[in-house]
């Protein structure tokens, strides 16, 4: 059963009288339906009295074997309410039919076999018979004859019955009624009880309390089963198991979970189950890295052709450690001035503090005469925005929740370690793989250590994602990163950049004035919770913005399993984000070409001083 929150609750399933299928033979009403029995009382638990029970046969004419009496001392406990009822002897005989001679059912007696494996999903209960007890009344010479017949049948049962029929039961099994079994002929009774309890046997388990039943109700179901056991020989154990058969082939726990997930997937066929688990850690343990000199080519095989990115600092490509074969990402930083090395040392110091699976991990740092190379965890999924604009990807609001929650987890850890990223943007959020929803934050080149008691100001970043305090060159705090998170969330939901202008000046003016709004068309399918989440981040006043911890407690980022069932509408942001990425690429190419042309003109005129060269 799937709860409201989507969990599969597994539990022992009671087999009530109303839920049990009818007998296979004739599909007619069962014997228990034809002859309803009165509710059992405390008197039913005492040995029967021929005078009090007019329906009991005369012991002199139809004596019961003493072996049919159950030893109360060996009984594990009263019957659980709703447990399956005992099977008839006719369904378990060596040839598939009951013994007409009145012997007990096949496998109904004998020493118990080895305990079944813990993974067994059905358990057999062998109800021990005490040969010292006998029914009331004078048995005479018939007692010895019946006892011999019972012994022969028990021996036949041990030879021909399956192994699991002899396995001992857990204490939660059905206990036999103390009432005499002379209501039906001996050939139609059995002492085997199978239960569908899929738990490991525990001798300390009392059993009946868990089922919530009473001894009286349990005895009533036993009495009804004994009356109907004569028709059980034609029943099938699997599929249409009738109520006379006390064996239920309960599937294993893993199968039940799989079936529940399949059912959920069928009910919500338009929703794909999200892998909202935390991403796996780096393929190497967290380490404290120190910048050292060395020969890069002797330790690593650089693959400069497989470029992963680049910028003002240099380029990023893949590489392989020769000693271990570990694939890594190599960030090659040009060392032109002493400040360049100082910035790299600060980046190494920051990354040494960040041991979190939503944050990229540093492996090694090597300095050469002209470069500093940082070897980091390789993340193969690519940029988040590149991933979600794929035509085969179905972006929903729930996907956005999963992405944003992981980003918040990484930011929260950074802030607890007194680190500010200060350059959160879509390019710095990578997917772990090309198919899942797991992301990691990268690029700590602009990150700073943060002390709330000290004033910290910065004047760098990407204009679209800068906060008002950075543009104004005011004191920053951990809330500065939260503004950038609000911009990223806005873009994931709508595909639009809230402050993007025709140029950087217009963009910065929009940021300073906090001039933004929810576009009616693009936010048509977005929930009010998502809008409230963004509104509490894109606030000019730092103190009014949510922290990372408050974001994780926001209603929008919680109860994802429940929201996934009803929030399956595809967002329009996919199409708009694709246009945004195309425009971003065009802008980068335009700037690069313009800079190259300008440099060519200036160099030809000999006025390099205009560029500060």
Curated annotation (Swiss-Prot):
EC number annotated for this UniProt entry: 2.7.11.18
Residues with the Phosphothreonine modification: 462
Top-rank EC class of the record's enzyme: transferase
Keywords: ATP-binding, Calmodulin-binding, Cytoplasm, Kinase, Nucleotide-binding, Phosphoprotein, Serine/threonine-protein kinase, Transferase
Residue spans of biased composition, Polar residues class: 1-20
Residue spans of biased composition, Gly residues class: 95-105
Biased composition (Pro residues): 56-66
Amino acids binding ATP: 308-316, 331
Biased composition, class Low complexity, residue ranges: 106-122
InterPro entries tied to this protein: Kinase-like_dom_sf, MLCK2_STKc, Prot_kinase_dom, Protein_kinase_ATP_BS, Ser/Thr_kinase_AS
Ranges for region Calmodulin-binding: 591-603
Keyword Phosphoprotein: yes
Protein purpose: Implicated in the level of global muscle contraction and cardiac function. Phosphorylates a specific serine in the N-terminus of a myosin light chain.
Subunit structure: May interact with centrin.
Protein name: Myosin light chain kinase 2, skeletal/cardiac muscle
Source species: Mus musculus (Mouse)
The encoding gene: Mylk2
């Amino acid at each position: 059963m799937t709860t409201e929150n989507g969990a599969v609750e597994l539990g022992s399933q009671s087999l009530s009288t109303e839920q049990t299928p009818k007998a296979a033979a004739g599909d007619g009403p069962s014997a228990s339906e034809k002859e309803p029995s009165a509710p059992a009382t405390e008197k039913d638990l005492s040995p029967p009295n021929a005078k009090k029970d007019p329906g009991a046969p005369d012991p002199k004419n139809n004596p019961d074997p003493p072996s049919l009496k159950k030893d109360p001392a060996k009984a594990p406990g009263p019957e659980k309410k709703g447990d399956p009822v005992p099977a008839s002897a006719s369904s378990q005989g060596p040839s598939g039919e009951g013994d007409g001679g009145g012997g007990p059912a096949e496998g109904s007696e004998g020493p118990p076999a080895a305990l079944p494996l813990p993974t067994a999903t059905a358990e057999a209960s062998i109800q021990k018979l005490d040969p010292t007890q006998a029914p009331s009344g004078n048995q005479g010479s018939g007692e010895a004859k019946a006892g011999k017949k019972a012994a022969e049948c028990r021996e036949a049962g041990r030879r021909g019955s399956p192994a699991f029929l002899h396995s001992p039961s857990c204490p939660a099994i059905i206990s036999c009624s103390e009432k005499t079994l002379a209501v039906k002929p001996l050939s139609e009774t059995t002492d085997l009880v199978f239960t569908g309890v899929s738990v490991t046997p525990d001798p300390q388990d009392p059993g009946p309390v868990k089922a919530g039943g009473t001894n009286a109700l349990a005895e009533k179901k036993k009495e009804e089963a004994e009356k109907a056991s004569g028709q059980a020989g034609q029943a099938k154990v699997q599929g249409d198991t009738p109520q006379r058969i006390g064996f239920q082939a309960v599937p294993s726990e893993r199968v039940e979970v799989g079936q529940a997930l399949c059912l959920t997937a069928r009910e919500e066929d338009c929703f794909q189950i999200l892998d909202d688990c935390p991403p796996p850690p780096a393929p190497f343990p967290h380490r404290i890295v120190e910048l050292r000199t060395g020969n890069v080519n002797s330790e690593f095989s650089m693959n400069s052709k497989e470029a992963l990115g680049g910028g003002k600092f240099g380029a990023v490509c893949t590489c392989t450690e020769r000693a271990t074969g570990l694939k890594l990402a190599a960030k090659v930083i040009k060392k032109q001035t002493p400040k360049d090395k100082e910035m790299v040392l600060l980046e190494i110091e920051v990354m040494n503090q960040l041991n979190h699976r939503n944050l990229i991990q540093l492996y090694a740092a090597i300095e050469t005469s002209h470069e500093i190379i940082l070897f980091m965890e390789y993340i193969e999924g690519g940029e988040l925005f590149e991933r979600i604009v794929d035509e085969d990807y179905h972006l929903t609001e729930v996907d956005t929740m999963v992405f944003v929650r992981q980003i918040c987890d990484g930011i929260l850890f950074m802030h607890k370690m007194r680190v500010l990223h200060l350059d959160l943007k879509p390019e710095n959020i990578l997917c772990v793989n090309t198919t899942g929803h797991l992301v990691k934050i990268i690029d700590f080149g602009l990150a700073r250590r943060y002390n709330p008691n000290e004033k910290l100001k910065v004047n760098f970043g990407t204009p679209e994602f800068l906060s008002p305090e950075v543009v104004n060159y005011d004191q920053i705090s951990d809330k500065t990163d939260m503004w950038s998170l609000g911009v990223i969330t806005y873009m994931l939901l709508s595909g639009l950049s809230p402050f993007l202008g025709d140029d950087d000046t217009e963009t910065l003016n929009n940021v300073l004035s906090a001039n933004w709004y929810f576009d009616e068309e693009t936010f048509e399918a977005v929930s009010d919770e998502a809008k409230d989440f963004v509104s509490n981040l894109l606030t000019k006043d730092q103190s009014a913005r949510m922290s990372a911890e408050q974001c994780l407690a926001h209603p929008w980022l919680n109860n994802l399993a429940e929201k996934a069932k009803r929030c399956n509408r595809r967002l329009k942001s996919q199409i708009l984000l694709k246009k945004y990425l195309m425009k971003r690429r065009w802008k980068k190419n335009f700037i690069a070409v313009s800079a190259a042309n300008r440099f060519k003109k200036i160099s030809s005129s000999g006025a390099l001083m205009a560029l500060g060269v």
